[in-house]
Amino acid sequence: MPVLHNRISNDELKAKMLAESEPRTTISFYKYFTIASPQQTRDALYQVFTALDVFGRVYLAHEGINAQISVPQSKLETFRQQLYTFDPALDGVRLNIALEDDGKSFWVLRMKVRDRIVADGIDDPTFDASNVGDYLKAADVNAMLDDPDAVFIDMRNHYEYEVGHFENALEIPADTFREQLPKAVEMLREHADKKIVMYCTGGIRCEKASAWMKHNGFNKVWHIEGGIIEYARRARAQGLPVRFIGKNFVFDERMGERISDEVIAHCHQCGASCDSHTNCKNDGCHLLFIQCPQCASKFNGCCSEQCCEELALPEEEQRRRRAGRENGNKIFNKSRGRLNSKLSIPDPAE
């Protein structure tokens, strides 16, 4: 029986990836379809991906698959063929190719079985996730942005919205997708007669959100096909104005893809114009925040003086201090509440 999980340390794997000479392509894809045996499917797909030297993060559940991966360019066409023939439901599935890509997005393959491919908190047996809103392509998106009867809804987290979003899009203030869904219904009641356009990074969240809105009585619901990634790619290919402003946050080592030249966010420590996310260098904190190069140097990559001082302690003392809190911090390191409690975010610099 082959080993169906990684047994090499992260440091060794990362060093091996960085030493690679062959370029890689970063890809994301998802598909809602019924998987009778997620664990069996996971194990079979793991062997296919491992044989092709695929790195990345893949979630499987009874409701489908969600993947963010990198593939050696010489094996990209073979990967595409094997994925499309793995299951009839995956034949022709849209592959979102990264917009900015140095091939260093992942260094290990992790495949997990979960209850849902997107944690939505929905516990309603009458909900039909397949009853989704209509797709919008790039030209349609631009037309909707000029339609006074349309309302754009950003179904991403606060830290994603902060660095980039569509013009005049509404933010749903919540830390997680499961918290956003009921809030979106509540916030949009006053816009029930409007055209509701939902979007996210690659399409997986806004597709389910569109079905949830329809389930709650909204009739005029659309979502952007392929999310921000596919919109920007198609708009550029077709010579259309790109109406997304700023950076598209991504969940890998890059932490973002530049869509437009505008920098709409600010350093959380000094207020300077900046949209570069980082995790606090103190492993006992790991807070996700925006930090400019000057503050990165001043605070040694940390989010605060306290974390900077802790990072300077002997390693044994650091381990003692973070015992019992490290896992919790890594789980909640993106919450708005924790960000506000750790940092007194200044007003943007003049």
UniProtKB/Swiss-Prot annotation:
Pfam families from the UniProt entry: Rhodanese, Rhodanese_C, UPF0176_N
Catalyzed reactions per annotation: uridine(34) in tRNA + AH2 + O2 = 5-hydroxyuridine(34) in tRNA + A + H2O
EC number, as in UniProt: 1.14.-.-
Alphabetized UniProt keyword annotations: Oxidoreductase, tRNA processing
Biological processes, Gene Ontology terms: tRNA modification
Top-level EC class: oxidoreductase
Active site: C200
Domain of life: Bacteria
InterPro entries: Rhodanese-like_dom, Rhodanese-like_dom_sf, Rhodanese_C, TrhO, TRHO_N
Entry-linked HAMAP family: TrhO (MF_00469)
Function: Catalyzes oxygen-dependent 5-hydroxyuridine (ho5U) modification at position 34 in tRNAs.
NCBIfam families cross-referenced by the UniProt entry: PRK00142.1-1
This protein's name: tRNA uridine(34) hydroxylase
Organism: Salmonella typhimurium (strain LT2 / SGSC1412 / ATCC 700720)
